[in-house]
Amino acid sequence: MTESTTDPARQNLDPTSPAPATSFPQDRGCPYHPPAGYAPLREGRPLSRVTLFDGRPVWAVTGHALARRLLADPRLSTDRSHPDFPVPAERFAGAQRRRVALLGVDDPEHNTQRRMLIPTFSVKRIGALRPRIQETVDRLLDAMERQGPPAELVSAFALPVPSMVICALLGVPYADHAFFEERSQRLLRGPGADDVNRARDELEEYLGALIDRKRAEPGDGLLDELIHRDHPDGPVDREQLVAFAVILLIAGHETTANMISLGTFTLLSHPEQLAALRAGGTSTAVVVEELLRFLSIAEGLQRLATEDMEVDGATIRKGEGVVFSTSLINRDADVFPRAETLDWDRPARHHLAFGFGVHQCLGQNLARAELDIAMRTLFERLPGLRLAVPAHEIRHKPGDTIQGLLDLPVAW
């Protein structure tokens, strides 16, 4: 019997077929569930084709096992300077070609960069940092309690916790937090490429000037160590230092702040699971892992094939883009039964919220420590914490690549 050429699953794997109808990435209707428009991807194979904003078809990975395999495959490049590298949104069209430390380079350069930073983000170093994180969390909750309810949790707690911690770790003055937080927001969610590029320029100028001052007057942050410490591969030049500072500062506060606020909203919207946490039968560390899986706030890792690859019955050609839907990968029912359910009893630590392979998130130990301490202390100190407005009035950040809340009014 002849196989039908109109079979949609087969056609979706054929690069010569018409551009696929599913666009990627998409805004979420609900901040903690994948977009409804991803339904065709969820019902099909772990590898299919989608269309980017500019109409370009690329490969989309939605299965957990396949994602682990491909994220560890050196034939898929993260080099954003390549003209064919997939751009997830129009606002990134110009910025995508600029130098990006760690996330945007391949080995051996990536390995060289990562070796410089690994000691700072090791389990041991982050463990030693936990008392400082706890002190920061307690100080912010003290201020909230003095002011009394209601409070806006994003500005009062979720954003300051990681901002204060990453500033102390890097040696960036927290007094400048309004400047770099605003530029970070524009860089990630600006209305167009010009605004994204201006935000990046302003942030690089600020951090470059800070690095110049640190050369003359050393402090005790990571940037100071990178400037003045001897490195096996030689001194770190100014351009590289600025690139490090940009990625570490943004990644070090933006994603964790979104996880704290969105994680809190998710718990307050799931009373049964929150009751189990408050009863003390579940550790906060377990809750954090399940929230990381369930929320998958960073969507759409990108790669570029550097040679032809046979993958899951399809051929990914050299020069074709590959994107990874973290929100669907972490809802793979073959790995996470009842994946749509928030479940403290499931082993969730093998989620891919931090990526996988050599480019797995360098700061995941820090993020886990901040989330563990912030979430545990928040619900211990404010046992009556609740939403101050109906859930449908909570505004989430517009965006298709990183999820978060604009504000979170709470009372207790």
Swiss-Prot record:
Listed cofactors: heme
**Any idea of its EC number?**
1.14.-.-
Q: Which UniProt keywords apply?
A: Cytoplasm, Heme, Iron, Metal-binding, Monooxygenase, Oxidoreductase
A single GO CC term for this protein reads: cytoplasm
Q: Which residue ranges are recorded for the region named Disordered?
A: 1-38
Localization per record: Cytoplasm
- Which InterPro entries has this protein been placed in? Cyt_P450, Cyt_P450_B, Cyt_P450_CS, Cyt_P450_sf
* Sequence ranges of Polar residues compositional bias: 1-25
The coding gene here is cyp105D1
Q: What's a single GO MF annotation on this record?
A: heme binding
This chain's protein is named Cytochrome P450-SOY
Please give the family membership noted in the entry: Belongs to the cytochrome P450 family.
Where on the tree of life does the source sit, at the highest rank? Answer: Bacteria
Enumerate the residues binding heme: C361
Q: Which organism is it from?
A: Streptomyces griseus
